[in-house]
Design a protein with these regions (language model features):
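Short hydrophobic beta-strand element within catalytic cores of glycosyltransferases
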Residues: 298-301
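Aromatic "clamp/platform" in nucleotide-sugar-dependent glycosyltransferases that forms part
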Residues: 262, 281
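A conserved nucleotide-sugar
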Residues: 33, 199-203, 218-258, 336-339
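A conserved mid-protein helix/loop that constitutes part of the nucleotide-sugar donor-binding site
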Residues: 17-22, 203, 207, 212-227
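A short helix/loop element that forms part of the nucleotide-sugar donor recognition site in Leloir-type
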Residues: 187-199, 340, 377, 381-384
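Conserved acidic donor-binding segment of nucleotide-sugar-dependent glycosyltransferases
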Residues: 313-324, 333-338
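A short, well-ordered alpha-helix in the C-terminal region of glycosyltransferases
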Residues: 333, 340-354, 363-366
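A short, active-site helix/loop in glycosyltransferases that binds the activated sugar's phosphate group
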Residues: 144-173, 181-185
């Protein structure tokens, strides 16, 4: 099978990029050829004998919106010239003007725009808010076209599939393939808090994510911390430009909130804390949640989560991501009852064992093969029909 992946990144260290990396790696391992049309591609894929990397952005471009437009144009131009070289073209959401056979849906921009927690509504007049609204509206408009033109859509969760269906997409076009996790990298083990300058004696929660904007919702965690005075929180995310250190000061919890910046040692960090808290206002299927579960951590998330339906006994889900009181009650429970914390962590790990990357990649490749087989059958039926017509005319 000759596969083209159209996406911004195929990268072991990136969220969606990691999904693309695992698909490409599994396809190459099965003997297929993979061409990546992207801004960045892992050398392991690009330098593989059956791998190829087409760079669709070679010049510096100032804003994400302009970068996306440039990428969409350049990738579409290349695909139009080379489309006949591929059996399957898969795109990640809207990334190219050229229609794809399969579109993977990691995020539904129009759903985020409609979300009551979308922070950039028309009541905000700042240039940054206007820009965020604009880029979300444009993405929402073109992703609808990308979804409708594809033969198949792969949603990363049932939650996401439901959002896509609101576009009027047939259920027959939709397949759910969950993201995965590396259970060898993320696993329970001895704590190494000293590596991060953290005390061994304190109950410790973990938050990982972008802390420059409000979507990941660190603010509610900080407010909840006021009601759980014995709990400390470690925050892993780029601190530069973030308002949250100042907010922690205002809420008088800064002495218990440890901003360690962005780190590549997430697996070690997860083995060093007691539970994971992530009340995001909108998520389709974040990898960090599965990584926490694979590490044997109880997880606490909001109901605005594509992954909330598989947490089960491995954590707690609360409805309103802005409800600091409800979150504080859950965190207090996890601090006070270590045995409950332990049993939830075991359940979380067991659930993660059923969601490994090998299963995710196999799910994508199965969709590719099913679509190809359906096309072969349609082509075969078409040839048979023409033969039947010819035979009928001969008999006459």
């Amino acid at each position: 099978m000759r596969i083209a992946l159209v996406t911004h990144k195929v990268d072991f260290q990136d969220g969606q990029g990691r999904v693309n990396y695992e698909i490409a790696k599994a396809a190459l391992d099965r003997g297929h050829s993979v061409t990546v049309i992207a801004e960045y591609c892992s050398s392991e894929i690009a330098n593989h004998p059956r791998g190829r990397f087409i760079c669709a952005r070679e010049i510096p471009i100032p804003t994400q919106l302009l970068r996306n437009i440039y990428f969409a144009e350049k990738s579409a131009r290349w695909l139009r010239q080379h489309r006949d070289e591929f059996d399957i073209i898969q795109a990640n959401g809207f990334v190219t003007w050229e229609p794809a056979d399969i579109v993977a849906v990691h995020f539904v921009h129009s759903a985020w725009l409609r979300n009551p927690f979308f922070p950039f509504h028309w009541s905000s007049f700042s240039p940054y808010a206007y820009y965020q609204r604009l880029i979300t509206i444009i993405n929402g408009h073109y992703e609808k076209k990308a979804f409708r033109s594809a033969d198949k859509l792969i949603a990363v969760s049932r939650f996401t599939a439901g959002e896509v269906a609101e576009y009027g997409i047939s259920q027959e076009k939709l397949v759910v393939v969950h993201n995965g996790v590396d259970i060898e990298e993320f696993h329970p083990g001895p704590a190494v808090r000293s590596e991060f300058g953290l005390s061994e004696e304190i109950p410790l929660a973990l938050f990982v994510g972008d802390i420059k904007t409000t979507r990941k919702n660190l603010e509610t965690v900080l407010k909840a911390m006021q009601s759980v005075p014995e709990l400390h929180l470690v925050v892993a995310g780029k601190v530069e430009g973030s308002p949250y250190p100042a907010i922690a000061e205002e809420l008088k919890v800064s002495d218990r909130v440890h901003f360690i910046g962005k780190t590549s040692k997430i697996a070690s960090l997860m083995r060093s804390v007691d539970f994971f808290v992530f009340p995001s206002r909108y998520e389709a299927h974040p990898l960090v949640l599965l990584e926490a579960m694979a590490s044997g951590l109880p997880v606490v998330v909001s109901g605005n989560f594509g992954a909330a339906d598989y947490i089960h006994a491995g954590g707690r889900v609360f409805d309103d991501p802005n409800d600091a009181s409800a979150l504080a009650t859950i965190m207090e429970e996890l601090v006070r009852f270590p045995e409950k914390r332990k049993s939830m962590g075991v359940a979380a790990r067991e659930q993660a064992l059923n969601m490994q990357w090998s299963q995710t990649a196999a799910g994508y490749l199965d969709v590719y093969e099913e679509l190809l087989e359906k096309r072969r059958q349609s082509a075969s039926a078409g040839h048979l029909s023409m033969d039947d017509v010819a035979n009928s005319q001969e008999k006459k």
